[in-house]
Design a protein with these regions (language model features):
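Beta-strand-rich solenoidal segments
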Residues: 3-169
Length: 169
């Protein structure tokens, strides 16, 4: 159990830390739904089962069988001659528009989620990490099939994301 140092004069910071702990617990609860490779178009990410989530406290749903395309050129991954390359994409939605937001390409294991600025006013629903094998052809976001031999893909669902209390207090 977390205890707070009563001698600290920074009571506000202690409260923010406590609220962040609660938020972490709630934020990591499962969101109903799953994602994977598209079936109508294997170049897209598909919502396999409906995703239920909160957007500004309001319940929203992304219907099963919704397929979301990558952005041509912007979401490409350039292959490297000797090192596998990763790129992390987040599936985000505001309940009206659902899209993929790309992080920065990096060596395998070093790619990071896109910045808060890129995520914008959306709820993060899932994470996709694509890896392009070294010495392979590039990943062309508009035409490459996600089950192509030179691509390894991982799909994860996310908990409910919310601003950190320590960021706003």
């Amino acid at each position: 159990m977390k205890t707070f140092d009563k001698s600290h004069a920074d009571f506000k910071a202690n409260i923010a830390e406590g609220l962040d702990m609660i938020l972490d617990f709630v934020a990591n609860m499962s969101v109903a739904g799953t994602i994977g490779i598209g079936t109508a178009a294997k170049t897209k990410v598909k919502v396999l089962t409906a995703i239920n989530f909160l957007y500004h406290g309001e319940p929203k749903t992304i219907a099963a069988n919704t397929e979301v395309a990558f952005t041509a050129t912007t979401d490409d991954i350039t292959a490297h001659a000797t090192v596998d390359q990763d790129r992390t994409y987040l599936l985000v939605s505001n309940g009206t528009t659902t899209k993929l937001v790309a992080g920065v390409q990096a060596d395998t294991g070093l790619s990071e989620d896109p910045s808060e600025e890129l995520i914008g006013d959306n709820t993060v629903l899932g994470r996709i990490v694509l890896t392009v094998a070294n010495g392979s052809t590039d990943f062309d976001a508009s035409t490459d099939l996600l089950d192509a031999a030179h691509i390894t893909d991982v799909y994860e669902m996310e908990g409910l994301y919310a601003p950190r209390f320590s960021d706003i207090m």
